């Protein structure tokens, strides 16, 4: 397919990702047609017609450079992010986090985009994928059915599905490897799972804690969709004391290795129950808890799941969530610049690409918008270094294992590891990663 010769770029959706994409394109001197259906057609979750509205929390999370999202925000500031700039201008006290006056922030983003001389705001619902120009689609996690069908068809009838559950993800370096063993069920294929065995006593205590743990409240627009997807582990536990033993905690085919010295029930060769951990990224630094999709409160997840042998001191880089979302099979469908592999004139941004969180959504819009503009100008694509947060996040969502791909927040586990001996002190290690990231980003920008 040849590159579009249109004199403008379309951006569909004026949430965080779409607003950022539109600004990044316009600041490079390219006219933008920015489509937003709110004002013509309401959504269940939005309260206003303002751009970049924050639907749930008003927090952009941690602001320290020893926090991955804090690093991402600093990188975005250096890249002239409209979301970060207006967030700073409408900041409210929140300790070490960055929180904003929800209404003031959204109004200021809206005003800046509506008053930009190169941005034409069109309040209308888009039900077809435009073919008149380079287009960035950033329609959010609840994309309308009509447009979702078109995206589904564009991708060959595959790769755009409803996301109902995500299991927690753990930093491998915080797992007590002396209590787990590597094995695949029935020894099929290579040993690919870390197995956390439980005795009957351990399982009974875990089951009791899980069934009595406090669940997170549901948003009104999620309630009717809650049980359409995978069953939460806590719901499964409440259906019967042995239900999980025939599901994600099934021990069959996961016998103890010969050198196992941990607790066991008598001379049994197989544990009473097993929790499996599956590698979540190519680097092998992250593992998810297989089958443990959940809607427990985050504090409860930490308390209950740290009862699993080997996870007593585990650090969770993402807690499990339950809600309906639309997201793409980005590893198969998108390049590292969020460009469609099937249609080079088409870019996607926001939560539909598999990034999770306000800041991450805006960052994806920055990457997609920047590269849509570079395509328009027939310039080489800009892929940020994997040593940066804004480079590692697109790399993760477009290179993850497609079969097990789930949305992801930015975290240090997906950023390229430091060279040389591992820095044992976590704070010092994160400071070193952040320092390298900002230096590499500055070098990247200086080379343009």
UniProtKB/Swiss-Prot annotation:
What this protein needs as a cofactor is: FAD
- Keywords from the UniProt entry: Cytoplasm, FAD, Flavoprotein, Methyltransferase, NAD, NADP, Transferase, tRNA processing
Q: Which GO terms describe its cellular component?
A: cytosol
| Residues forming coiled coils | none
Where is the protein found, in the record's own terms?
Cytoplasm
Reactions mediated catalytically = uridine(54) in tRNA + (6R)-5,10-methylene-5,6,7,8-tetrahydrofolate + NADH + H(+) = 5-methyluridine(54) in tRNA + (6S)-5,6,7,8-tetrahydrofolate + NAD(+); uridine(54) in tRNA + (6R)-5,10-methylene-5,6,7,8-tetrahydrofolate + NADPH + H(+) = 5-methyluridine(54) in tRNA + (6S)-5,6,7,8-tetrahydrofolate + NADP(+)
Binding of FAD: at which residues? 13-18
- Top-rank taxon, per record: Bacteria
Per the UniProt entry, what is one GO biological process?
A: tRNA wobble uridine modification
EC class of the enzyme, as a word: transferase
Q: What this chain does, per the record?
A: Catalyzes the folate-dependent formation of 5-methyl-uridine at position 54 (M-5-U54) in all tRNAs.
Entry-linked PANTHER family? GLUCOSE INHIBITED DIVISION PROTEIN A (PTHR11806), METHYLENETETRAHYDROFOLATE--TRNA-(URACIL-5-)-METHYLTRANSFERASE TRMFO (PTHR11806:SF2)
**Which family is annotated?**
Belongs to the MnmG family. TrmFO subfamily.
Can you name this protein?
Answer: Methylenetetrahydrofolate--tRNA-(uracil-5-)-methyltransferase TrmFO
Organism of provenance: Streptococcus pyogenes serotype M28 (strain MGAS6180)
Organism lineage string: Bacteria, Bacillati, Bacillota, Bacilli, Lactobacillales
- The gene it comes from is trmFO
